[in-house]
């Protein structure tokens, strides 16, 4: 069986250097060695988040990291605002409702993302809401939301902003502190170039203060337990992979990594447009390209042929745009050879 070439919104190919790092021998996780590894990982992640705050690692998916933010920053019955501009943004609302929160949803345009005016209106309409859950990079659409002005607006009203950056971190430059974001959640399987199963949370001082007031029951995802501690068995192999990934990023240089992500995104979007298709996101990030084909185009057949004939996997649409588009992922490391092969294979599927 041939190895699949992944052009998914995540996971993607794990670079050889990262895979080898994850294959290093395991060791006692109740040891100084692990504490030193966690300190190194935290130091390496801070520049990617653009923060001087704390960074913690969870044995969970990105959704687990999202849930950790909800339970640590809210109390039962509390009113919260969720900005919904895609399937994964809506997940914030689903998690919050599961914990008995009073959820106020702001419906953003799925192609353009949320506007400052929409968020300003929500803050005026629901003045009792103290926490706003937003999505920087929407994995279901490819939209990259502008967080800077929104963050400053929320900060000016002494409220807490939490952002999902699962498909944006290490793909596009992030400035958590400068954008006045109080907590950011991600998963390992996208821009960080690590296998799935590691949640990462960056936490600023205002989020810590809010967590001290939270009365939502929590155990596994209790940030206070996790800070500077290893209360549960960690995803050790994934932490070792992340160590390799951060070394890779530091060796390449963050600016070069971001430029490469943008270059790959540009080439794929050029392919989409010259194939007579449309890029779904009007404000796209560098990690995911949502594609609207011509009316009547068989998207399922394209995906089948790419996989069966060329060994390439791409993704379908999700939620209310499921039947409108498909998605090409390029959130992680893509070599020139892989990109050229993808473009050639995609064009073959359309012409043969």
Question: What name fits each language-model region?
Answer:
Residues 177-189:
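Conserved active-site segment immediately N-terminal to the catalytic lysine
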Residues 1, 320, 324-352:
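PLP-dependent enzyme catalytic core of the Aspartate aminotransferase-like
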Residues 40-49, 247-280, 305:
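Conserved PLP-dependent catalytic core of the aminotransferase class-I/II
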Residues 114-170:
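Active-site phosphate-binding strand-loop segment of PLP-dependent enzymes
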Residues 278-309:
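Conserved PLP-binding catalytic core of the aspartate aminotransferase-like
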Residues 52-81, 85, 89-93:
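Conserved beta-loop-alpha segment that forms the PLP phosphate-binding cup at the N-terminus of a helix
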Residues 13-14, 189-270:
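Active-site C-terminal subdomain of aminotransferase-like
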Residues 2-59, 63:
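A glycine-/small-polar-enriched, mobile loop at the entrance of the PLP active site in fold-type I
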């Amino acid at each position: 069986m041939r190895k699949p070439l992944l052009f998914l919104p995540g996971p993607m190919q794990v670079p050889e250097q990262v895979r080898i790092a994850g294959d290093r021998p395991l060791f006692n996780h109740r040891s100084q060695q692990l504490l030193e590894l966690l300190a190194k990982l935290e130091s390496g992640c801070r520049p990617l988040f653009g923060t001087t705050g704390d960074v913690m690692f969870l044995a969970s998916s990105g959704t687990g990291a999202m849930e950790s933010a909800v339970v640590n920053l809210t109390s039962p019955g509390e009113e919260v605002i969720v900005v919904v501009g895609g399937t994964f943004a809506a997940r914030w609302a689903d998690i919050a409702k599961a914990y008995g929160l009073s959820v106020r949803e702001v419906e953003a345009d799925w192609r353009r993302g949320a506007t400052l005016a929409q968020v300003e209106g929500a803050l005026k309409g629901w003045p009792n809401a103290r926490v706003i859950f937003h999505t920087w990079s929407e994995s279901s659409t490819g939209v990259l939301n502008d967080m800077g002005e929104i963050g400053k607006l929320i900060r000016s009203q002494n409220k807490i902003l939490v952002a999902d950056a699962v498909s944006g971190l290490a793909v596009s430059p992030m400035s958590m502190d400068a954008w006045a974001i109080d907590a950011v959640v991600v998963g390992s399987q996208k821009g960080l170039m690590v296998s799935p199963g590691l949640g990462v949370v960056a936490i600023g001082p205002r989020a810590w203060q809010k967590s001290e007031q939270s009365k939502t029951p929590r155990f596994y995802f209790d940030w206070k337990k996790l800070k500077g501690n290893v209360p549960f068995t960690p995803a050790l192999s994934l932490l070792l992979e992340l160590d390799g990934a951060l070394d890779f990023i530091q060796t390449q240089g963050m600016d070069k990594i971001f430029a490469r992500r943008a270059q790959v995104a540009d080439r794929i979007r050029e392919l989409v447009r010259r194939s007579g298709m449309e890029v779904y996101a009007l404000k796209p990030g560098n990690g995911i390209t949502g594609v609207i084909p011509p009316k009547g185009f068989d998207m399922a057949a394209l995906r089948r042929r790419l996989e069966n004939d060329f060994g390439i996997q791409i993704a379908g649409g999700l939620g209310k745009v499921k039947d409108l588009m498909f998605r090409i992922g390029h959130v992680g490391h893509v070599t020139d050879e892989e990109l050229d092969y993808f473009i050639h294979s995609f064009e073959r599927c359309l012409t043969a």
